[in-house]
Amino acid sequence: MAKLFASVKRLPVLAGCVLAAASYPPIPADLTTPVQQRLAINGPNSFSIGWNTYQKLDQPCVQYGTSSDELTQQACSSASVTYATSRTYSNVVTLADLSPATTYYYKIVSTNSSVEHFFSPRVAGDTTPFSMNAVIDMGVYGVDGYTIQMDEAKRDTIPTIDPSLNHTTINQLANTVDDYEFIVHPGDFAYADDWYLKTKNILDGEDAFQAILEQFYAQLSPISGRKAYMASPGNHEAACQEIIVGLCPTGQKNFTDFMTRFGETMSTAFPSTSAAEAAKINANKAQLLAKPPFWYSFEYGMVHFVMINTETDFDNAPDGQGGSAGLNSGPFGAPDQQLEFLEADLSSVDRTVTPWLLIGGHRPWYTTGGGGCDSCQAAFEPLLYKYGVDLAIFGHVHNSQRFQPVFNNTADPNGLDDPTAPMYIVAGGAGNIEGLSDVGSNLTYNRFAYADDFSYAKISFLDANNLQVDFIRSATGEVLDTSVLYKSHKAQFVVQ
């Protein structure tokens, strides 16, 4: 980042040479036109539909059904909210009592909307094999972001070439949309806080920040409006920029857009379907302690998935008050609430129902090229090991990495053959204006590291004992690395 900050020091000189030019998308003539659509798993047999409009809606509604010609059901809400500096309103409707694993068609009620479709969530315990994708650190492309012609040998430099409006990761997700069932994105969306890296934005940072958010979520909507898109925070959601946060206007700090956009769509925690009374009690406790979209969990078929917040709400959190990142955000819960949630949630997982236990968060503590989060490791790693998390997915470092299962900086001697330690991956190479990160010094327990091109991870649940991780090159779809984790899952409840 040193070169990036050196560039920032020159901004006052550049400011006298440019005109303000925030690149807002055009506002549709029909202000009820839905934009920035996003879906999420909201609960058992429950799906949330989120979208934005350029005016407040008195009653956001969605029509839906199992045939595109017969949208016989309708759900409505009163959730149409905005914040200072935003041009749009966020709307959310939840569809409940859906038949599991079923294709539904839906239409957001507007005089200018179309019929789309989604696949409803699998019930916990469904043993049908399926795949999901992990996409992290993905930013806007085009005039305010990166382009596929960027010279990836130049790390942390400002791209100055003309854009090619082609986002290779989103294109690959679109081309393979029938090959996966949902996406997890643990942090760093859009990179709106990097608005100052384009000189045209220097005199109009407030509008440039909002324009980038509108651009990015419009670019993402062909995917997020079709597949459940499960979000948790990263450092680039915190404020309007990471250098002098105190200059950010109201509405552009303390994760405001992230909370407004995703807060009502994400789940809390699912009620336990275990026969064990303790599991039900712990799941109910987790449900009360959850704070979506910052920390929460959901179940889908063979997997129990937990999203954590590596930015705030634990000791020495980097983005918290007085934290090392200087973003002074949060807290969003009571003291220790996130860790109490995590312990309650992990202890509720019945492996006879959901054999696979996965974690998603933003900042990794195992990484080959620097950027590891020591305070995150101190807060979270003991719980991940204690309750037998199988796979932990992180980003923040802009490349792809896979590690042998590891605990307390020591590789598990069993490798991928029934380890007790979690397997860790970094899937931060989806593409953003800051470029890719060098692989760096190779740790002894690293098994794959790639920073030559944009990429993401595909996780396939083959059965109750075998999980496959593939790293995909976004531009071509080729598999860069593949591995299969075997877990015996002998214990109904893991405590070690």
Q: Model-flagged regions — what are they?
A:
Residues 15-29:
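N-terminal signal peptide
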Residues 1-14:
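Classical eukaryotic N-terminal signal peptides for Sec-dependent ER targeting/secretion
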Residues 26-436, 448-450, 458-496:
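Metal-dependent phosphoester/phosphodiester hydrolase catalytic core
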